[in-house]
From Swiss-Prot:
GO terms for cellular component: cytoplasm. Its EC number is 2.7.1.23. The active site is at 72 (proton acceptor). NAD(+) binds at residues 72-73, 146-147, 157, 174, 176, 187-192, 247. Belongs to the NAD kinase family. Its main location: cytoplasm. It is found in: Cytoplasm. This is NAD kinase. Keywords: ATP-binding, Cytoplasm, Kinase, NAD, NADP, Nucleotide-binding, Transferase. One of its GO terms (biological process) is NAD metabolic process. It comes from Pseudomonas putida (strain ATCC 47054 / DSM 6125 / CFBP 8728 / NCIMB 11950 / KT2440). SUPFAM superfamilies: NAD kinase/diacylglycerol kinase-like (SSF111331).
Amino acid sequence: MEQFRNIGIIGRLGSSQVLDTIRRLKKFLLDRHLHVILEDTIAEVLPGHGLQTSTRKLLGEVCDLVIVVGGDGSLLGAARALARHNIPVLGINRGNLGFLTDIRPDELEQKVAEVLDGHYLVENRFLLQAEVRRHHEAIGQGDALNDVVLHPGKSTRMIEFEIYIDGQFVCSQKADGLIVATPTGSTAYALSAGGPIMHPKLDAIVIVPMYPHTLSGRPIVVDGNSELKIVVSKDLQIYPQVSCDGQNHFTCAPGDTITVSKKPQKLRLIHPLDHNYYEVCRTKLGWGSRLGSSDD
């Protein structure tokens, strides 16, 4: 397993719990004589840290492991910035759900030590890249680890659009919007809209209509290498938005085309050896535990 010597730290701003955890993590890493680099925005609120700092974009060039302290939203933002560097990312949960940031603060030293000693799992999670085009010209681009969502923005009106997959017409729909999600994102917004849960190792994309104006509007799972094209109706009287992971937003006009496809670079997500995807689902989604009579 790869040995890590240069460790970057990214954290969610505005939380004293995050800062406390970062201080613990920093001390632990320095005690192991590792080179620690702080993201510059976090460094500004940690006076006297005495460490090298870097912007998030450049962090991937100077580190061989990045640890994210925060919630899943923090890791989503880090993933979009770091995927192009092919650098491993480890998450310490200081948020709510913790689907991606799966190390609890109370087990920080133990689990991080295991990873640094080479005892870890690596998952390659693919991202989506989205582009909004108007009159054959790109007006907005963004990446997403979870999902790309077409929605009406501040309007309460429905959106009319057409869906094409690999150049083939699939259907036209009238709905509150459309969610295009990765397996990683299948347990996020897409799940709330009635989409299926997809195992992270699947090479697939799920397309989930949001409150479609027809009983036949159902989620569809397609090959992960598919290229999706969503054409907004020219007769639409609102300007819908496209959101990537709920963090990057672009405004569309009637007649615009949104293309969504797999991004070439993947996120290398690190887990402790005892990571169990089904246990995560059971814990975070409230699935039932084993029956008391089960012997297995």
